[in-house]
Structure formats: C-alpha cells, structure tokens
Amino acid sequence: MRQIIIAGNWKMNTTLSEACTLVQSMKCELERIEGIEKIICPPFISLYPIKTILENSSIKLGAQNLFYQEKGAYTGEISPLMLKELCQYVIIGHSERRAYFGETGQVVNQKIKAALQAGLLPIVCVGEKPEENENGQTRQVLETQLKEALDGLNLSCIIIAYEPIWAIGTGKAATASEANSAIGYIRRVLGDTLGNAAAQTSPILYGGSVNEKNITEILSQTNIDGALVGGASLKAESFVSICRQAAVIQNKH
C-alpha cells in the first residue's frame, strides 16, 4: 500500500502569530501519529518560523506556490531555491491559482520542472469546474490537465491531488465513490503518460471539503492515497483528528 499523505493547505489565512500558535497547538498530537506523511502548507511569511518550531519533527512543510525561475526581476515572486531552504513540498496548479491568476497548463508544467530541479516535491492539483462535471467532461478535463502538467517529464513518482472545483470550500464534497472513480481514471492517465510503474507508485490525494467526519470513508476507497485539506486544516482539533483516522487506516495494511 502507498503511504497515506495528509496535507493541510492554509491558503491566505493566519497572521504570523496566528500561524505559530496554530502549529504549536497541534505539534505534540501530530508527532504522536505514526505511519503517514503529515504536511502543513502555510503562507510564505510563516514558513521560516514554523520550520523553526518543527525542527527535528516528523511533520513536513510545504509551500502553496512558486515561480519557475531561480532568481531575477520578478517582483513579488518566490523562487524554488528560496523554498528549498524552508520546506520539502510545494503545491502547484491549484484551481485558485488557475482561476484568479490565469495559470495555464504550460505554466504549471514549468513550475513542476522548476520544483523538481530544486529538489522540491510537487503536489500537482487537477480538477474540473461545476459545468464540466455536469456536462460529463470530467475525464476529458483531467486527462488534458495531466498531460499538460506532465509534458516532457520522465518520473518514477509524482503526487497528484484531485480537487473537483465544485467541492472546494463549498461544504459539498464529492461522494467517496465519485472521488474514487475520478482518481482511478487519473491513475490510468498516469500509466499512459509516465508508465505503469509510475502510476502504481504515485500517491493520488483527494481534496474538496475534506473534514474529520468524511475522511475515513474517503480513505477507505481503493484508489485514494490521502487528502489535501483546506478549511479543516486551520482547526487544530479537526486536522489532528483527520491525521489520526488516516493513521488507523494506514496501519491496518
């Protein structure tokens, strides 16, 4: 069985002091949870202080974005080399980046290559819009996004997060069977794109209104290897509960 990954995406939430308080409030409980990969993705400004708090911890850090150049006249951007000193993971291609900042499949591809070059592990997000879901275009959209994102890459493993846009922040998660079906298809596309071995080793996460009440059902599905958690990751009790339930499932196998 692939190792379960639980990643908390804080998005544009928490001040510096709030971020440090939140991490300190759940650090001890999270460190007691074994067998899964636990990742926190705070805003950029909180990465360094949280890194200090989590020194020698089993809890990993991730960024929410990066730019694809190492340095230069790119005002307001963060480079892979800067992040490499602070964290292990980086979220790339989140639907909010695509919607609000116009990120294309080509840009996502450049960012993945830049992250890998710097030794960062990308968490690549894909997912369909509400109207695409209603029109039966989910598979077509996922295939296009994946092929654009992975163009020119020869990888033995990549982390993918399936986040149907209609489920993000709405409180309306995809049903476990819907998520399982879509993620099964993503694995097929990975097989076609990167080869069967990569498809079998690559963790595929579900994201979209994940909480402590639905995580066990989600992770009990055969194709789902973890979760990218939004709002629930901003509540210490909820995030710890999600990680604890994930570890129970992991340790059964």
Curated annotation (Swiss-Prot):
Pathway(s) of this molecule: Carbohydrate biosynthesis; gluconeogenesis; Carbohydrate degradation; glycolysis; D-glyceraldehyde 3-phosphate from glycerone phosphate: step 1/1
Superkingdom: Bacteria
Catalytic residues as annotated in Swiss-Prot or TrEMBL: 94 (electrophile), 163 (proton acceptor)
Gene3D superfamilies attached to this UniProt entry: Aldolase class I
Binding site for substrate: 9-11, 169, 209, 230-231
GO molecular function, one term: triose-phosphate isomerase activity
Location(s) in or outside the cell: Cytoplasm
Keyword entries, A-Z: Cytoplasm, Gluconeogenesis, Glycolysis, Isomerase
Enzyme Commission code(s) on record: 5.3.1.1
Keyword Cytoplasm: yes
Entries under SUPFAM superfamilies matching the protein: Triosephosphate isomerase (TIM)
Top EC class of this enzyme: isomerase
InterPro entries reported in the protein's UniProt record: Aldolase_TIM, TIM_sf, TrioseP_Isoase_bac/euk, Triosephosphate_isomerase, Triosephosphate_isomerase_AS
Family: Belongs to the triosephosphate isomerase family.
Protein's job: Involved in the gluconeogenesis. Catalyzes stereospecifically the conversion of dihydroxyacetone phosphate (DHAP) to D-glyceraldehyde-3-phosphate (G3P).
Assembly and binders: Homodimer.
Name this protein carries in UniProt: Triosephosphate isomerase
